[in-house]
């Protein structure tokens, strides 16, 4: 139950780009007291640009559509996440925790740090990512981009087949380390 002193000052903030898998579009909305909304609007107008018109139109159409699609997408994301977590944790030298949000997995590569690939030492997440891309054509984001050295970020916002093929190539890459 809400304290009486908070009534009238509550805010509702909703993200549409994540809920409807509009990756990178950064669109949502907020509802609340006029004074706070004006302050947020002022800050936002000086800090970032506005959402593009295509993203705004897509968000509007998504809100007007059947919400069952969100439930269906969530189920697909969960299936991909669970399959990827299981596969990653079966690869010697790699591990991950089951993510609770978004559609990214932080791949722990510390178990392969110090090993070599074609004579090059895996001394950072950047090196791991570069070699993986160059030789196996799998793109991951090195953890140093998130101040998470020793990790690489994987996305499961693609088809299950793409996720599993990427992991097959990562496993092949890791098996070739010396």
Region locations from a protein language model:
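PLP-dependent class I/II
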Residues: 9-178
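Single conserved hydrophobic/aromatic residue that forms the stacking wall/gate
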Residues: 1-10
């Amino acid at each position: 139950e809400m304290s009486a002193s908070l009534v009238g000052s509550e805010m509702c903030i909703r993200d549409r780009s994540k809920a409807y898998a509009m990756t990178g579009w950064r669109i949502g909305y907020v509802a609340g007291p006029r004074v706070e909304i004006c302050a947020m609007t002022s800050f936002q107008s000086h800090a970032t640009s506005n959402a593009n018109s295509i993203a705004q139109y897509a968000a509007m159409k998504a809100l007007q559509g059947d919400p069952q699609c969100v439930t269906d997408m969530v189920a697909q994301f969960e299936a991909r996440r669970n399959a990827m977590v299981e596969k990653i944790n079966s690869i010697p030298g790699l591990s991950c925790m089951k993510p609770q949000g978004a559609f990214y997995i932080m791949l722990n590569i510390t178990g392969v740090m110090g090993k070599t690939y074609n004579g090059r030492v895996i001394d950072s997440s950047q090196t791991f990512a570069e070699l993986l891309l160059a030789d196996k054509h799998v793109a991951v984001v090195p953890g140093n981009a998130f101040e998470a050295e020793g990790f690489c970020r994987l996305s499961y916002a693609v088809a299950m087949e793409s996720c599993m093929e990427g992991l097959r190539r990562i496993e092949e890459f890791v098996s070739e380390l010396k």
